[in-house]
Every structure is written in C-alpha cells, then in structure tokens.
Amino acid sequence: MKNISDIANLAGVSKSTVSRFLNGGSVSPQTKEKLSRIIEEHDYQPNQFAQSLRAKHTNLIGAIIPRMNSHAVDETVKGIVSVCHQHQYQLLLNYTGLDIRAEIEALETFSRSKVDGIILMATTLTDEHLEVIEKLNVPVILVGQSYPNLHSIIHDDYQAGFIVGEQIGSKKHKNVVFFGVSEEDVAVGVKRKQGIIDGLKKYDVYPEIYLTSFKYEEAKNDVSEKLKNASGIHALIGATDPIALAIHKFYSQQNNATGNYQIFGFGGNPMTQLVTPAITTVKFNYFKAGTYAMNQLNELIFSKNAVSKTVIPVEIENF
C-alpha cells in the first residue's frame, strides 16, 4: 500500500505539497491534476485520523459508558450513533465498569485525543469530575445525571418513582419492600427513591428499604439474604429492572414465582415482559436520550446555543 512519501516521489513533489493538496490547500492546477491521477491509479487512502488532527474538527465523539450488557446503555448508544451518522461523526466508546477513577481518566484521554465533544453517562458526579470537565477545551453533555451549569439529558426519575409508589398505594398494598442503590447516584439513589416514598406516603404506606447494587449478580445475593425469611409481602420494588429481575429470580427459585405479590422495576427492559408473571416497569426512552444528547452536543461543537437541561418523560408498561 502506498504512503504519502510514495505519492510525493511519484509526482515529483514534496510531502508537504501532497499534504496541502489532501487538506484542500493551494497547489497549482498542473500539480493538482497530477496528484489526483496518481492517487486514483494507486488507490491511495489518506490517514483520516492524522488529517483530522490537523483540521479544526476531528469528527470524533467520545462516549463514556458505565456498564456493558445494559439495556439502558445499549439503547442510549444506539440513539447517539443514529445522530453521529447524520453528521458524519465517528463514535469512540470508553467503558468504565462503574469506576469513578476510570471515568476521570476517560475524560482526560478523550481530551488528549482531540475529540470534538464528549458524552458522559455518569452514575456519580464528584468534585474531581467537575474540575476535569471545567478544564476541558471540548463540550461535554451529561446523560442520566444533572448539575448546574452543565448541559444534561435526564429522565424524570422522581416522577417515575412517584407513579410506582402511587400505583402500589392505590392497590391497598401495605407490606412493601424496596431495593435501592447508593445515594451517590442522585438520579436513582435519591430522586427515584424519594418519588417512591412520596407516592406511597399518600396512602400511608412506608416501605422497608434495603441497599443493593446495580449489578444483577450482586443484587441476587442481596435479595436472597434479605428475603429468605420474609413473608406476607404485597409488593417489591427494584430501583432498576435488573434488580427487579433479581427479585423475580429469587421467588422462582423458591417455587413461588406466581405468588400473591407484585414486582416493580424501572427501565423498560424487554426481559421484564418475558418472565412469568411479567414485571411492571416504568419505561425510560433511552434511545431518545441518546439522540437528544448527540444533537445538543453537535450544537455546542459549532458554538450554538443548546438547552441546558432536557427532562425526558417516562412511560408505563404492564400497569
């Protein structure tokens, strides 16, 4: 395969002349014709990444994702990709495994890689996150969390929780168990939980609250430990669909998958509708969140005004 030096030698010009031609710079008509012919004859493909680094925009977008094999992440990324294709961006993914240090390093790595913008799907925002973001020379969009003065796309977590709490209370369920996550995640650990509590409180219902993990396997262990001696429960709530599925798994292993109780989750994961009985879930439009994030990031890249915070409504499934 020919490189830029080979093309320069064949044309009898310098490498800088070839580079100038490839980047749309000024060269003589004769040289332009000669280079066009040689490049076509030898099917020369310039290094697009190297070219992009010399240009004002690289057409590279960095997305920092917290989990793999996640319905929420998968759908959000699909939304991002759909808009990237419209604007000829290339998407780079950095998986952090819910590790805060890895998220910080990913922000710095993408900045050094000269991406045009960054989409951060964070579960927690620390002071260090904010310090790094403030120093970056590229726009950043948050998805799933919000913070003053940062552009963000969020789901209406409080309303989602309130809907579930109100639904359970209206059915006269009194013995309610909720498996939540750490309050370090403000959206799920604080807002969603508070919505549930407030919705139940309307009916004078106060749930038993346990702390667990976003990770399905860890949630299964926590659920098993807390429910092994429990009885008479009317409703069980998982802060996410994977946690709700962990609850369902526990009862199915107890040969009580169709007992006199109802399980609720959040996210709209298709798996919740494949189990028996189906789990009642609040559906979040993750794909739309991805498209909104990328469209707003594109506006910021070109110094246009973008909405500071977008709240996406939730939908109810199997109520």
Language model regions located:
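Hinge/beta->alpha junction and helix N-cap segments in small-molecule ligand-binding domains
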Residues: 65-75, 93-101, 153-163, 179-201, ...
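Short, well-structured alpha-helical segments in soluble
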Residues: 101-114, 218-232
